[in-house]
């Protein structure tokens, strides 16, 4: 069983042994939806003949002397498995088959290794036994040899090394396979060896290596001479079989063949070392190692540890020593994300899940854990699991991936770099769907228009790189954050636009320069940004997941502003807060950056008259913008605007032209004489000398 792919707990693992369940939040999800959910199309498209338990029985993959192997689909996880189907009638008639079936289940529950197939579940019906194992999509190694005629030496070295590692693990556990052949070697999705079929294996842990076996087992072509001679044998019979498999990989044939077939003649060829000719392209080290494995005398034949230390086998594997795999998963290696998902979402008892996994007992609980964990591993590999050095638990790879996507692979950072290379202003408007906010939200939302100069419009020029860097010293696409007080903080508020687009359809709009934008005074910019900041504040945080319903199509909100200079603040201090002009609203005495907004509502009788004073065709724009845009009367419009989410603070590239003959919004609003005591006021006379 593979190691854990994710970890969702920070508590001590010893608490799990006591059966204590970790605290779980109601809204917490432990696995991504693509892992925890199974689509109906997956179940519908799987061709199957019947269903047994939680498995759909599909096409036949192979057929042996004792059973048939079919492809299956686990309906809980949507993962494919291999199912060995054994007929009960045949098993009961032959006690040897029944004995081998019981032995295979017992041995595979004892063993856990990456090059040995994992037994997941055992089912029994009225007519059949079902052994559920992990599926190896790479197929049989014999098919690969048939296609290529023979394998290259470096490829054969890889497979032989993996086979020896698996056999060494078996021998350390006291298990002798006795039936190692090409047909029992499968390939997984990563082109690695998987050893199957333990029907003829025997457990030497009970008898010990000092009392070897005496039964004749295995295929004669792969069997050691002592097996054919019905002599007592030990675990070195597997070493001989590895030599036969190595010869078959390198040549595509068997080392010892006789015509017509005779066990006595075959045995005599083995004893006489009458091996079929070897290809001349093989290296001397490979030939020497192969002859040592096919030594007919068991006393001269190397054991599995000596074979693993051979120089040819470890070529190109320097520094990769023998790694021992425990036959039981340790508690700290459990995938806590999968365990929590099973106990909280699938209804399994937490202590039962832990006990089944630690004991490696084949049942449906183990199958669910193994398949979900493998599914999570594939998900992390496909998403290019990052290498993050932070305070997150090193096993919590899913949460590391989410944090990496937000901090390292943000589209805004890549977009800003591209714009800087092209020398264009870094403006990127996106339309996002708005949510119908409650009245309390609308009352707390505020769009603040700022005063502007009464000077005529001048030709707009693009700000230089030094000017762009002076805007707070941060990228305009700096990440928007939520402070502890619930307010949104950002330094990218130069252009704002909020419109109601088509549902869930963000659109990218091309930038069109407007002649109504004013030039920022570079020489006075350092003093202005110390006293003035054009920002918008949202007094309550908005949960973006709750923004599902869109506003009515007849609502349209826009806020337009000129580029401003931002004072270099700490990220925690860049809170969106409103700034108003209270004492004097005359644009001749105070110079503000130009900002305006329009509110179009078909349900309001005055909505057709609303327009944007910054429009090129606006009368106020043609008359040197004589409207009082800095008036605090616009505070009345706060109740009409919904809460602003993070994705709604967007930069404007298009200025929508309003119909001619419309009056600005502030001319049809009554004056507001009393302001909320929570707003900070300042005297406009402090701005003297700056304009």
UniProtKB/Swiss-Prot annotation:
Record-annotated active site: 179
Biased amino acid composition, Low complexity: 604-620
Keywords of the record: ATP-binding, Kinase, Nucleotide-binding, Serine/threonine-protein kinase, Transferase
PROSITE patterns xref list: PROTEIN_KINASE_ATP, PROTEIN_KINASE_DOM, PROTEIN_KINASE_ST
Coiled-coil parts of chain: none
UniProt catalytic activity: L-seryl-[protein] + ATP = O-phospho-L-seryl-[protein] + ADP + H(+); L-threonyl-[protein] + ATP = O-phospho-L-threonyl-[protein] + ADP + H(+)
Molecular function per GO: ATP binding; protein serine kinase activity; protein serine/threonine kinase activity
Residue ranges occupied by any Protein kinase domain in the UniProt entry: 55-313
Biased composition (Basic and acidic residues): 406-425, 457-470
UniProt biased composition (Polar residues): 440-453, 582-597, 621-631
Pfam families xrefs: Pkinase
Binding annotation for ATP: 61-69, 84
Cross-referenced InterPro entries: Kinase-like_dom_sf (IPR011009), Prot_kinase_dom (IPR000719), Protein_kinase_ATP_BS (IPR017441), Ser/Thr_kinase_AS (IPR008271)
EC number: 2.7.11.1
Record bears the keyword S-adenosyl-L-methionine: no
SMART domains: S_TKc
Family that this chain belongs to: Belongs to the protein kinase superfamily. CAMK Ser/Thr protein kinase family. SNF1 subfamily.
Name recorded for this polypeptide: Hormonally up-regulated neu tumor-associated kinase homolog A
């Amino acid at each position: 069983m593979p190691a854990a792919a994710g970890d969702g707990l920070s508590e001590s693992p010893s608490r799990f042994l006591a059966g204590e369940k970790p605290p779980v939040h109601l809204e917490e999800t432990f696995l991504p939806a693509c892992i925890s959910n199974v689509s109906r199309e997956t179940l519908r498209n799987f061709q199957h003949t019947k269903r047994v338990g939680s498995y759909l029985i599909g096409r036949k993959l192979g057929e042996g002397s004792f059973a048939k192997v079919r492809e299956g689909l686990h309906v809980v996880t949507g993962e494919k498995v291999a199912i060995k189907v054994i007929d009960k009638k045949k098993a009961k008639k032959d006690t040897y088959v029944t004995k081998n079936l019981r032995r295979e289940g017992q041995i595979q529950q004892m063993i856990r290794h990456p090059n040995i197939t994992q037994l997941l579940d055992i089912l029994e019906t009225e007519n059949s036994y079902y052994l559920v194992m992990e599926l190896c999509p790479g197929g049989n190694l014999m098919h690969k040899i048939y296609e290529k005629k023979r394998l290259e030496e470096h490829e054969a070295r890889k497979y032989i090394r993996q086979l020896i590692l698996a056999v060494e693990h078996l021998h350390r556990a006291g298990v002798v396979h006795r039936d190692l052949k090409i047909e029992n070697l499968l390939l997984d999705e990563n082109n690695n060896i998987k050893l199957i079929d333990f029907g003829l294996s025997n457990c030497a842990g009970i008898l010990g290596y000092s009392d070897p076996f005496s039964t004749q087992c295995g295929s004669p072509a792969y069997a050691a001479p002592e097996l054919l001679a019905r002599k007592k044998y030990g675990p070195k019979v597997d070493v001989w079989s590895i030599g036969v498999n190595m010869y078959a990989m390198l040549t595509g044939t068997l080392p010892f063949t006789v015509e017509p077939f005779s066990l006595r003649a075959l045995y005599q060829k083995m004893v006489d070392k009458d091996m079929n000719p070897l290809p001349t392209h093989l290296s001397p080290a490979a030939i020497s190692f192969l002859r040592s494995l096919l030594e007919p005398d068991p006393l001269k034949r190397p054991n599995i540890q000596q074979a693993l230390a051979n120089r040819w086998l470890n070529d190109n594997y320097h520094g990769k020593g023998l790694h021992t795999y425990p036959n039981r998963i340790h508690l700290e290696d459990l995938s806590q994300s999968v365990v929590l998902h099973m106990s909280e979402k699938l209804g399994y008892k937490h202590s039962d899940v832990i006990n089944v996994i630690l004991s490696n007992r084949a049942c449906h609980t183990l199958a669910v854990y193994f398949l979900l964990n493998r599914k999570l591993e594939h998900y992390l590999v496909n998403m290019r699991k990052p290498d993050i050095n932070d305070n997150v638990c090193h096993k919590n790879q899913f949460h590391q991936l989410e944090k990496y996507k937000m901090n390292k692979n943000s589209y805004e950072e890549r977009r800003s770099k591209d714009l800087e290379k092209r020398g264009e202003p870094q403006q990127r408007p996106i339309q996002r769907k708005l949510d119908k906010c409650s009245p309390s939200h609308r009352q707390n939302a505020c769009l603040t228009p700022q005063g502007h100069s009464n000077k005529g419009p001048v030709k707009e020029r693009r700000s230089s790189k030094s000017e762009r860097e002076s805007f707070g010293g941060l990228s305009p696409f700096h990440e928007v954050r939520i402070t502890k007080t619930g307010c949104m903080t950002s330094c990218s508020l130069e252009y704002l636009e909020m419109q109601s687009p088509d549902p869930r359809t963000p659109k990218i709009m091309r930038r069109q320069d407007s002649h109504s934008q004013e030039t920022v005074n570079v020489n006075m910019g350092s003093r202005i940004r110390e006293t003035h900041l054009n920002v918008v504040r949202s007094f309550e945080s908005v949960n973006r997941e709750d923004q599902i319903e869109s506003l009515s199509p007849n609502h349209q909100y826009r806020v337009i502003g000129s580029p401003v200079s931002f004072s270099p603040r700490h990220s925690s201090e860049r809170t969106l807060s409103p700034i108003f002009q209270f004492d004097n609203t005359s644009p001749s005495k105070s110079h503000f950056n130009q900002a305006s907004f329009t509110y179009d509502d078909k349900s309001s009788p005055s909505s057709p008259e609303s327009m944007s004073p910054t429009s090129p065709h606006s009368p106020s724009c043609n008359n040197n913008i004589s409207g009082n845009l800095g008036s605090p009367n616009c505070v009345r419009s706060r109740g009409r605007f919904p809460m602003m989410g993070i994705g709604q603070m967007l930069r404007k590239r298009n200025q929508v032209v309003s119909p001619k003959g419309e009056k600005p919004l502030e001319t049809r609003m009554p004056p507001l004489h009393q302001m909320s005591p929570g707003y900070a006021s300042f005297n406009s006379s402090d701005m003297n000398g700056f304009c």
